[in-house]
Regions:
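Conserved phosphate-handling catalytic cores of large alpha/beta enzymes
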Residues: 30-45, 49, 56-160
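Accessory alpha-helical DNA-binding modules that contact the DNA backbone or grooves
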Residues: 20, 25-31, 159-245
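Structural motif
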Residues: 3, 40-42, 203
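Single conserved hydrophobic/aromatic residue that forms the stacking wall/gate
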Residues: 1-8, 12
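Short amphipathic alpha-helical segments
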Residues: 10, 21-22, 62-66
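Short beta-alpha junctions and helix-cap segments that line functional grooves
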Residues: 6, 62-65, 198-201
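Structured core elements
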Residues: 9-10, 16-18, 49-53, 77-80, ...
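Gly-rich Lys/Arg/Thr-decorated short loops/hinges at beta-loop-alpha junctions or inter-strand turns
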Residues: 13-24, 42-46, 92
Length: 245
């Protein structure tokens, strides 16, 4: 039951700090046990926001969260998060690779929590067809549907931009000019050498050539760079013009 893991995917900087399983809708005793367990984790990990999936027992879990926050004296907020496709992700090969130590319920909880942090970064991991937007989408030929939905996802990713120091391979491979291989190489380089401190440093990534850099640079953000334009949609080729303005 996915409701047993609701709100438990407390994530900070893309890392899972703690997990537990509670049963807040199985009676008053179980609800109070859930409040005690979650309150302990909230204090331990300095949690400030709770993500509650909008699926089974969402309202009952919300009521428990309100009671818990009141007992804590405030300082914590919650939000109802659309969990469409979370169960599909939790049973996927990608989820198993990311969280081999967790069962599908805990993977779903992490996915729901991360959607509150960065919705786009999490939703790109899910087949767009599983999100269920549009009741007649499956009347289209599957190949054409995949191409259309994939194009929309990539357009969204490029329009928003991607933080190269936090993005997963699933998100990076949606950036124009990058492939699955170069996306994985970016993450591997980041893990081995530390965060990127400039867009120029992206050229050091193995198998990411000048053409690929030219295509992807404007969509990759580097917040830690001393060059302020590295954290904007301005392409390096236009830095001189932007600086003059």
């Amino acid at each position: 039951d996915s409701s047993t893991s609701r709100g438990l995917g407390d994530v900070y900087k893309r890392q899972v700090l703690d997990t537990t399983v509670v049963y807040p809708t199985f009676g008053e005793k179980q609800k109070q046990d859930a409040i005690a367990k979650l309150s302990q984790l909230i204090k331990k990990d300095n949690v400030r926001h709770l993500a509650i999936g909008n699926g089974t027992a969402s309202r009952e879990t919300e009521a428990m969260a309100v009671e818990m926050i009141h007992k804590l004296g405030g300082g914590v907020s919650y939000m109802i998060v659309n969990e469409a496709g979370a169960s599909v992700y939790s049973a996927s090969k990608l989820a198993a690779e990311e969280f081999p130590q967790y069962d599908v319920n805990l993977r779903s909880a992490v996915s729901i929590a991360r959607r509150l942090q960065d919705p786009l970064a999490e939703l790109v991991k899910i087949d767009p067809k599983a999100i269920g937007v549009g009741q007649y989408q499956h009347d289209m030929p599957e190949k054409e549907l995949d191409a259309a939905l994939g194009g929309v996802v990539e357009a969204c990713v490029n329009a928003v931009g991607v933080d190269i120091n936090t993005a997963s391979p699933s998100l990076l491979q949606r950036v124009s000019g990058l492939t699955k291989t170069t996306a994985k190489n970016i993450v591997a380089y980041r893990e081995e050498n530390g965060i990127f401190t400039s867009r120029k440093a992206i050229n050091k990534v193995p198998k990411l050539g000048p053409k690929a850099f030219q295509q992807c640079a404007g969509f990759l953000r580097v917040p830690e760079s001393k060059q302020v334009l590295d954290n904007t949609a301005v392409h390096p080729e236009s830095y001189d013009a932007a600086s003059k303005l």
